[in-house]
UniProtKB/Swiss-Prot annotation:
Keyword field: ATP-binding, Cytoplasm, Cytoskeleton, Kinase, Membrane, Nucleotide-binding, Nucleus, Phosphoprotein, Serine/threonine-protein kinase, Transferase, Tyrosine-protein kinase
Paired cysteines (S-S): none
Sequence similarity: Belongs to the protein kinase superfamily. STE Ser/Thr protein kinase family. MAP kinase kinase subfamily.
Gene that this sequence comes from: Map2k1
Name listed for the protein in its UniProt record: Dual specificity mitogen-activated protein kinase kinase 1
EC category: transferase
PTM annotation (Phosphothreonine): residues: 286, 292
Binding site for ATP: 74-82, 97
Primary location recorded for the protein, binned into one broad class: cytoplasm
Enzyme Commission no: 2.7.12.2
Pfam families: Pkinase
């Protein structure tokens, strides 16, 4: 279907000239923002949603600790705790991430300054940013609240995520990574199911990407638990690029498709338990080296073997064959897509442009999938009355 010429983005200046969290909301800023948004290939619905978010954001003004009321805890990890909060002056519901750091004021100020880049990150595939500030020993990052939570939470309820749904997830992740790279020259650095957020409108967005080098350095010691999604080249301490994010996406897709973290691979017996039938393929083979393998504590599978020690797991990622999807359960296109993401040599691994034209992505893009309906029935959410773009089954 040919794309309609997008109508210009309409952004109205805040009536009282209030600041967008400390930055001027002068009309020149709005014009620059309007121009950037028009460069993005958005459909009508995406354009309207982004427009609505940015118009709401103008009403927020400077963020202060006293202006928030805690509603509930959404999750913890990556060195911080995330709360669902109400921003009393605007009445908006937000997600507020609190990161406790024992750091000097100069470092703290640099982190807040670097986080301001997030104001420029406006894409349907990136979680919206309201602002960042420091208060009582904690850095607060205030974001759009995604009512479906993260895909690791969805996976716990679903058991496994269907291939058609993962097709839509793959498109959103590739488009989000492409946007970060092309428009902001940054890579994500931490792609995993808990950093892919979803909502009842059927939107899929990336969060927690490495925009602040100083924050990455300050939190270096808290990243041990997430190393299981890191690429072999990154674990070996060699140069890494956005190709590393592609490995992490591939690993995440295998985990969500199979229903458990895929290293070490499930054996034939476990695959039979997971899928309720005999499953062929490499994933069912015994790990190549004699060892006492097991799964990391974070997986959701039926593997009764003792969990792998973290050093053993990292050694496995670097030295053993990469995970694969079991054949006979998933389409050949999906299997090939994952294989191209999980090539150990980053120079041979598919890049974002190649993945965007892969047969699996082309097929997934053409498929009508009610992502919002599937999500809401899986996790018990009420679906909003406005149908999602892909929900016209």
């Amino acid at each position: 279907m040919p794309k309609k010429k997008p109508t210009p983005i309409q952004l109205n200046p805040a009536p009282d000239g209030s600041a967008v969290n400390g930055t001027s909301s002068a009309e020149t800023n709005l014009e620059a923002l309007q121009k950037k948004l028009e460069e993005l290939e958005l459909d009508e619905q995406q354009r309207k949603r982004l427009e609505a978010f940015l118009t709401q954001k103008q009403k927020v003004g400077e963020l202060k600790d006293d202006d928030f009321e805690k509603i509930s805890e959404l999750g913890a990890g990556n060195g911080g705790v995330v709360f669902k909060v109400s921003h009393k002056p605007s009445g908006l519901v937000m997600a507020r991430k609190l990161i406790h750091l024992e750091i000097k004021p100069a470092i703290r100020n640099q982190i807040i300054r670097e986080l301001q880049v997030l104001h420029e990150c406006n894409s349907p595939y990136i979680v919206g940013f309201y602002g960042a500030f420091y208060s009582d020993g904690e850095i607060s990052i205030c974001m759009e609240h995604m009512d479906g939570g993260s895909l690791d939470q969805v996976l716990k309820k679903a058991g496994r995520i269907p291939e058609q749904i993962l097709g839509k997830v793959s498109i959103a992740v590739i488009k989000g990574l492409t946007y970060l790279r092309e428009k902001h020259k940054i890579m994500h650095r931490d792609v995993k199911p808990s950093n892919i957020l979803v909502n009842s409108r059927g939107e899929i967005k990336l969060c927690d990407f490495g925009v602040s080098g100083q924050l990455i350095d300050s939190m270096a010691n808290s990243f041990v638990g997430t190393r299981s999604y890191m690429s072999p080249e990154r674990l070996q301490g060699t140069h890494y690029s956005v190709q590393s994010d592609i490995w992490s996406m591939g690993l995440s897709l295998v985990e969500m498709a199979v229903g458990r973290y895929p290293i070490p691979p499930p054996d034939a017996k476990e695959l039979e338990l997971l899928f309720g039938c005999h499953v062929e393929g490499d994933a069912a083979e015994t790990p190549p080296r004699p060892r006492t393998p097991g799964r990391p504590l974070s997986s959701y599978g039926m593997d009764s073997r003792p969990p792998m020690a973290i050093f053993e797991l990292l050694d496995y990622i670097v030295n053993e064959p990469p995970p694969k999807l079991p054949s006979g359960v998933f389409s050949l296109e999906f299997q090939d897509f994952v294989n191209k993401c999980l090539i150990k040599n980053p120079a041979e691994r598919a890049d974002l442009k190649q993945l965007m034209v892969h047969a699996f992505i082309k097929r997934s893009d053409a498929e009508e999938v009610d992502f919002a309906g599937w999500l809401c029935s899986t996790i018990g959410l009420n679906q909003p009355s406005t149908p999602t773009h892909a929900a016209s089954i």
